[in-house]
UniProtKB/Swiss-Prot annotation:
UniProt keyword Cytoplasm present: yes
Protein family according to the UniProt entry: Belongs to the SRP19 family.
One Pfam family per UniProt: SRP19
Annotated organism of origin: Methanosphaera stadtmanae (strain ATCC 43021 / DSM 3091 / JCM 11832 / MCB-3)
Record's protein name: Signal recognition particle 19 kDa protein
Length: 92
């Protein structure tokens, strides 16, 4: 199953109405596509980065997205794992 991960989903700078899926405590300030892909690499999950894509809620910004091929976790579990890995890597 393919899952789309937009940086907005885990961005603490965005509101729920703007597309954030995680709580403020779980989310990350301004996550980058590079950080998301590094996190997925650590989790050993296959992914494809698409740099020229825009989140529909902010179509004027080319934020990029990551297409993930996985079936082990729900989308929310995956987002939490990605955000946690990014937080851990920023603290080191």
């Amino acid at each position: 199953m393919k899952t789309i991960i937009w940086p907005t989903y885990i961005n603490s700078e965005h509101s729920r109405g703007e597309g954030r899926k995680l709580s403020l405590e779980e989310s990350v300030e301004e996550p980058k596509i590079r950080e998301i892909s590094q996190s997925l690499k650590k989790l050993k999950i296959q992914y494809v980065v698409e740099h020229n894509k825009s989140y529909p809620g902010s179509w004027w910004e080319k934020s990029g997205r990551v297409v993930v091929e996985q079936e082990d976790m729900t989308k929310l579990e995956l987002l939490r794992a990605i955000a946690k890995n990014i937080k851990n890597s920023r603290n080191n």
